[in-house]
Regions:
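C-terminal motif of bacterial Sec signal peptides marking the signal peptidase cleavage site
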Residues: 14-17
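Signal peptide-directed extracytoplasmic domains
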Residues: 61-102, 113
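Immediate post-signal-peptide N-terminus of mature secreted/exported proteins
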Residues: 27-71, 83-86
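Mid-length scaffold segments of soluble, non-membrane domains
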Residues: 90-164
């Protein structure tokens, strides 16, 4: 369903590239949408599609159960993980990893209003540039418009989620245990919140990019009157 919602977005953009939709002839009896109607259809399709995409991640196992997005310990902590598993302390590591993923799953839901603001701010020029651009043009648009806000908004949310799911505690237990080993020379303390923020933002954009790369040949989902009008006309062309 998510792919079909996003497909409607690209079809709408195709309509927007016409100089004046209202001056074109009628095709196969389908009413010709105005520029305003086409823009409305585009925004509706985007809102539905982004909502579905966020929904893929904002559920239990959205990160933990998906190998494409599953979070492990930060790169700087890989030595810690390997050492503790060799010493029979893998359970402590696994518990920390699980709760880190639960925190990310909880936090990504807060991305929705940020994406919706970017959609509402999209101009006709933005839409034309997207359709004329590369296959990931929409993802690039969202990266440009939302990355800074997503990172800023996610930072306190991720910290709260890490505490809510005790991920901070379990992670600190792992780090403290490793740092207290007599053989540990270089004590480590990687920044967990910044790591999770970066991974969560990357996962959101990756979800959009994956769909964008495959949507052009998927069936159309027309879920409102305006979408049926806009995309019924597009199909008749």
């Amino acid at each position: 369903m998510f792919r079909s919602y996003i497909l409607t977005f690209f079809l709408a953009i195709g309509l927007l590239s016409c100089e004046t939709l209202s001056k074109l002839p009628t095709y196969a009896g389908s009413a010709i949408p105005t520029d305003a109607e086409a823009a409305t259809g585009l925004r509706q399709a985007l809102e539905q599609g982004v909502g579905k995409g966020i929904g893929v991640l904002n559920v239990q196992d959205g990160f933990f159960g998906n190998q494409a997005y599953k979070l492990f310990l930060p790169a700087d902590a890989q030595l810690i993980e390997n050492t503790m598993r060799q010493l029979g302390m893998g359970g402590m590591v696994d518990r920390a990893i699980l709760q880190i993923n639960r925190s990310a799953e909880d936090a990504v839901g807060y991305a929705r209003p940020i994406f919706l603001d970017a959609i509402r701010d999209m101009t006709i020029t933005d839409a034309i540039n997207i359709v004329r651009g590369p296959r990931d043009a929409a993802t690039q648009y969202f990266r440009q418009k939302t990355t800074e806000r997503l990172t800023a908004a996610f930072s306190p949310v991720i910290r709260a989620s890490l505490d809510k799911f005790s991920a901070t505690k379990y992670y600190n237990d792992v780090i403290s245990t490793y740092n207290n080993f007599p053989t540990t020379i270089n004590k480590l303390n990687p920044d967990l919140p910044s790591y999770v923020v970066g991974k969560a933002v990357d996962a959101l954009f990756d979800q959009i990019a994956r769909e964008e790369a495959n949507i052009r040949e998927n069936p159309v989902a027309r879920t409102t009157d305006i979408l049926r009008k806009v995309f019924g006309w597009a199909g008749a062309r």
